[in-house]
């Protein structure tokens, strides 16, 4: 560790790898609400956050657990659930009068077509205005879960036992992974009917 008079200790949240202050400052200078998109292995979280001197204020939020209450039977950490979480957030935000935002991905890596950008695509399709590049968004097939369907069909054909093990939670909940795209459309329609 460096010592001496020229050494400066970084801010606590930077040391804990929670905040990139340079990126945060650039986002705050836009003076727009931030669409904060975060992903864990099993869940997706999306929030509309406003800056305040005493601490940021979350005005609208959506969590992939809310999809379960709507009847979603798929995994809550995959690409279709990330899109639906963003879509739900977008509908909630528009209902509260927030029409535009800037995307805040925090310390997540900006990889083309990942779940963070599926959240963004969901918010855009709900009607929000968020600056973005079209090439970064995931394809419609991946958003609907066509890649999961194709993998499930291939696995069921080749190794029935592995198929049952891989998709045990889907089957336990009564959803065949081959029907995920249709199930996705049902949940999206339910979100539309709420607003």
UniProtKB/Swiss-Prot annotation:
Q: Which residues cross the membrane?
A: none
Q: Which intervals of the chain form a coiled coil?
A: none
Keywords from the named record: Ribonucleoprotein, Ribosomal protein, RNA-binding, rRNA-binding
SUPFAM superfamilies per UniProt: Translational machinery components
Gene Ontology cellular-component terms listed: cytosolic large ribosomal subunit
Q: Does the keyword Manganese apply?
A: no
Q: Which HAMAP family match?
A: Ribosomal_uL18_A
Q: What's the protein here called? A: Large ribosomal subunit protein uL18
